Amino acid sequence: MNAKKCALKATLIRSVALLALAIPPLFACAATAQLPGKGVDITPIFPTIAEERFRGEIAMAGLKELGYDVQTPKETDYPAMLLALSYGDADFTVHVWENLHASFYEKAGGDDTLVKTGNIMPGVLQGYMIDKKTADAYHITSIEDLKKPEIAKLFDSNGDGKADMTGCNPGWGCEVLVEHHMKAYGLEKTVMDNRGSYFALMADTIARYEQGKPILYFTWVPQWISSVLVEGKDVVWLSVPRTDLPSGKNDVNTLYQGKNLGFPVDTVRAVLNKEFAEKIRRP
């Protein structure tokens, strides 16, 4: 393997595997490289979202390079994922959002049974977007504009007079925030939060956009949808009038380019079962 490929490979592994377990950088392409994971079984756990799996796959590849015997990953929803880690049914994940999953983390045992390690993906945004064409034509800039019946009707896809918004999967952390926002911003009379299989709903949303129809949806970035519906070209963020979170802890950063998106700017973290973390860190 040439030096350039070696460096790229090391960078890839460092980006997730080292952060996941918070172990020293022991990478090299030589056959004599140290293998801190030799003889250690490790069981990953992922959410049941294909679009999120790539981080786990990178982590597993890196851990195998470090000598760990990586077991078949388990899959479940986010609350159950953290409970499984807490109980020792799995050893690590790279899919926990610092703010969004805070209540799931605490309910699973918090720092008593779990350990947060590396920042896998910082600067994650969430918020509400609409198509730029409609935003420009009707001067829509804020989620509060949807309180106006004549504006809400622009996004009505089933004839009930309400704006149809693509929301979150039931059970996701964002579901709680979106439902809270519906009440906090007075949107319940004019906006319908359509919850279900998010990516199936987004396929319909994208199809509507391609037909030239107005669209309204919750999303987060980075993910693949932002490369299909491009910010500033196809769609724009809507601001919120104030930060209003279910926890009441509103003194957090919810700004993106001077616009309040209403959701904390988040960081995806690696989380380990505490007993497992202590075992692999012993000299």
Where are these regions (language model features)?
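Bacterial N-terminal signal peptides
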Residues: 14-27
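Short helix-initiation/N-cap motifs at beta->coil->alpha
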Residues: 49-50, 68-83, 192-204
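Short, polar/charged alpha-helical segment
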Residues: 50-69, 180-183
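Pocket-flanking alpha-helical
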Residues: 56, 73-112, 204-208, 224-230
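A conserved helix-loop-strand patch within extracytoplasmic ligand-binding domains
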Residues: 113-167
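C-terminal lobe and pocket-closing loops
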Residues: 226-283
